[in-house]
A protein has these predicted regions:
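Bacterial extracytoplasmic/cell-wall-associated proteins, especially those involved in peptidoglycan
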Residues: 1-187
Length: 187
C-alpha cells in the first residue's frame, strides 16, 4: 500500500457559508496548541502562488470543471476524492493519471469533463486562479476528513448504476460521495 502523508490541517467545520475552517496544530515547548484557520473564496484571493506543480494544475483543472459552481467546501470535497484515489492501489498513482483515466473513450472516463465530447475552456480566470490556490494548498497533504474516505462521487442530477456497489458516505453541495465498502472475512 502507498504511504499516506497527512499534515496537521484538519477540517473542523465543513460549512461556514462559503468557507471551510481548519485547526492547525502548532508544536511549541509548552506542547501543541490548536489555531483555527478559515479559508473562504475571499481569503483564497489573497494567497500568492509561486511555481505550481503540474499535478496541482491537473487537480485545479478537475476542480474547475467538476465543481466550480460549488462553494469552497464542495470544491475541497472533489479534490479530496481525487487525492484519496491517488493513495489507493486500485487507481493510478498521480493526480494527472487519476483525472485522465479513461479519457480516450467517449463517456468512459472517471471524470465526465474529460470524455463528454465537448471542448473544455477555462472562461472564468478569477475562479480558476482561486481554485488553483485551493488545489495547491490541499495537494501538500491536508488531512482528508470531509468525505469519509470517498473515492467516487456524482452530481445529484444523475443516478448512475455503479452506486449500488458502493457505500454512500456524504452529500456535500450538489454532489453525493461514495467509497468501496470494506468486506470482513468470516472464519
Amino acid at each position: 500500500p502507498r504511504a499516506i502523508v497527512k499534515k496537521a490541517f484538519k477540517p473542523v467545520n465543513e460549512s461556514i457559508g462559503d468557507s471551510i475552517e481548519f485547526k492547525l496544530a502548532n508544536e511549541s515547548s509548552q506542547g501543541s496548541a490548536l489555531d483555527t484557520t478559515t479559508f473562504s473564496s475571499a481569503s483564497l484571493d489573497y494567497l500568492m502562488l509561486s511555481d505550481v506543480d503540474p499535478q496541482v494544475k491537473c487537480l485545479a483543472e478537475a476542480i474547475y470543471f467538476e465543481a466550480r459552481g460549488e462553494n469552497v467546501v464542495g470544491q475541497y470535497a472533489v479534490a479530496e476524492v481525487i487525492l484519496n484515489r491517488v493513495d489507493q492501489n486500485q487507481f493510478p498513482n498521480s493526480v494527472c493519471k487519476v483525472v485522465s483515466e479513461g479519457a480516450s473513450k467517449l463517456h468512459s472516463c472517471q471524470f465526465s469533463y474529460n470524455c463528454d465530447g465537448k471542448p473544455e475552456y477555462i472562461n472564468d480566470l478569477k475562479s480558476y486562479k482561486r481554485i488553483l490556490k485551493l488545489a495547491n494548498m490541499f495537494y501538500d497533504g491536508t488531512a482528508r476528513l470531509l468525505t469519509g474516505g470517498a473515492t467516487f462521487y456524482h452530481s445529484q442530477d444523475v443516478s448512475p448504476s455503479w452506486t449500488t456497489k458502493l457505500k454512500k458516505t456524504r452529500e456535500i453541495g450538489r454532489h453525493i460521495f461514495y467509497k468501496i465498502e470494506s468486506r470482513v472475512a468470516l472464519k
